[in-house]
Curated annotation (Swiss-Prot):
One of its GO terms (biological process) is positive regulation of DNA-templated transcription. GO terms for cellular component: nucleus. The gene is MYB118. Pfam families: Myb_DNA-bind_6. Induction: Induced by LEC2. Mainly expressed in siliques. Also detected at low levels in leaves and flowers. The keyword Transcription applies. It comes from the Eukaryota. The keyword Chaperone does not apply. Residues 184-239, 240-290 form the HTH myb-type domain. It comes from Arabidopsis thaliana. This is Transcription factor MYB118. It is found in: Nucleus. Residues 212-235, 263-286 bind DNA.
Length: 437
């Protein structure tokens, strides 16, 4: 009811048509009178009705252009006494739409004799309200030619975009497969035969030392890198294949102190020695030293039978040796003392490689005078340890085996900070003093 009252207040003429009640215009507004009407009785047809051609599928119900005196009424109802304006508003040329059968209809404004009047030109609210009562069968909206063309273009563009994406994806996959380097069918990775070496020398004389890929094409199963390395490391005429001299070892040591393990740069300072040769010589010397150490030989015997390069490698790789690093970095740690006295676990102090204090102390205790070693007598040693326990000494044919009481051994080693290597050296000095070596 509120909607009806508001609608009658704002649209009195439409309310008179829709609701068709007997209320007068004065009921809606005092200024309105019944002297004129914009809606005439449709049963009374004029003698000369105006006919307009409008293309449509449905019959258009019309009303007579009413003699409205106010300007807003003519614009509101879409009617006017001006025939030119009325024709411009409601006469539309027939258009042919694609995919739609064109049927022209000549309908007059007075074709329907029903009491209900249709006010041509009104939209939205009125037509939606009347559509529920099925009084008018409104046609479904159809796309115009331009809209249909635009939709088709959008669909075609989407299809083209998807097609281009698929093409790009396939192209990237194909390029990835094409750019992937193809492996040689059968690459020989074994040793070079004398026939291959001879052929390689001939090809290098013919093509030089720059065109290795071209040379590799003439050697079945070989690539350019293999040919280059074989030539520079083995087949080059100026390569030295004899043993290493002391002078070359000194040059190698000096260069290694300056630039480290840069074998290619070191090879420039050693004519006739290739990068591979220098590296192999270094590693072979290092392996020999390690194998001799693992066999149980002490540092004294290693130093007596080693050359300059071995001594340098031992000094460089001292911190890399796990056993020696553990001895050097341990501040206090247990050591199993063998060769002197009983097997006793004692705590030893840190051992410094560059410090020879233990040798000096040992020599002073042994009484080195005028190049002659004076060993303390066994009686004095046993007397010093008689306060606690007794001691004994025994000798064998090949060497001297001494067994001293634990208090004497522990106190002497702790005082001088000896470890297993030190004790072996002291035992060696004792054997020299007794003339056993």
């Amino acid at each position: 009811m509120e909607f009806e009252s508001v609608f009658k207040m704002h649209y009195p003429y439409l309310a008179a048509v829709i609701y068709d009640d007997s209320s007068t215009l004065k009921d809606f507004h005092p200024s309105l009178t019944d002297d004129f009407s914009c809606v005439h009785n449709v049963h009374h047809k004029p003698s000369m009705p105006h006919t307009y051609e409008i293309p449509s599928k449905e019959t258009i119900r019309g009303i007579t252009p009413s003699p409205c005196t106010e300007a807003f009424e003519a614009c509101f109802h879409g009617t006017s006494n001006d025939h030119v304006f009325f024709g411009m508003a409601y006469t539309t040329p027939p258009t042919i739409e694609p995919n739609v059968s064109h049927v022209s209809h000549d309908n007059t404004m007075w074709e329907n004799d029903q009491n209900q009047g249709f006010i041509f030109g009104t939209e939205s609210t009125l037509n939606q309200a009347m559509a529920d009562s099925n009084q008018f069968n409104m046609p479904k909206p159809l796309l115009s030619a331009n809209e249909d063309t635009i939709m088709n273009r959008r669909q075609n563009n989407q299809v083209m975009i998807k097609t281009e994406q698929i093409k790009k994806k396939n192209k990237r996959f194909q390029m990835r497969r094409i750019c992937k380097p193809t492996k040689k069918a059968s690459i020989i990775k074994g040793q070079w035969t004398p026939e291959e070496d001879k052929l390689l020398v001939q090809l290098v004389d013919l093509h030089g030392t720059k065109k290795w890929s071209q040379i590799a094409k003439m050697l079945q199963g070989r690539v350019g890198k293999q040919c280059r390395e074989r030539w520079h490391n083995h087949l080059r005429p100026d390569i030295k294949k004899d043993g290493w001299t002391e002078e070359e070892d000194i040059i190698l040591i000096k260069a290694h102190k300056e630039i480290g393990n840069r074998w290619a740069e070191i090879a420039r300072k050693l004519p006739g020695r290739t990068e591979n040769t220098i590296k192999n010589h270094w590693n072979a010397t290092k392996r020999r030293q390690h194998s001799r150490r693992t066999k149980g030989k002490d540092e004294i015997s290693l130093s007596l039978g080693s050359n300059t390069l071995q001594n340098y490698i031992r000094s460089v790789t001292y911190n890399d040796d796990p056993f020696m690093t553990a001895n050097a970095n341990a501040n206090i740690g247990p050591r199993n003392m063998r060769g002197k006295g009983k097997n006793v676990m004692v705590a030893v102090s840190e051992y410094d490689e560059g410090e020879c204090k233990y040798i000096v102390d040992g020599v002073n205790n042994l009484g080195l005078e005028d190049g002659r070693i004076k060993m303390p007598s066994l009686a004095a040693m046993s007397a010093s340890g008689s306060a606690s326990t007794s001691g004994s000494a025994s000798g064998s044919g090949s060497g001297v085996t001494m067994e001293i009481d634990e208090p004497m051994t522990d106190s002497w080693m702790v005082m001088h900070g000896c470890d297993e290597v030190m004790m072996n050296e002291i035992a060696l000095l004792e054997m020299i003093a007794h003339g056993r070596l």
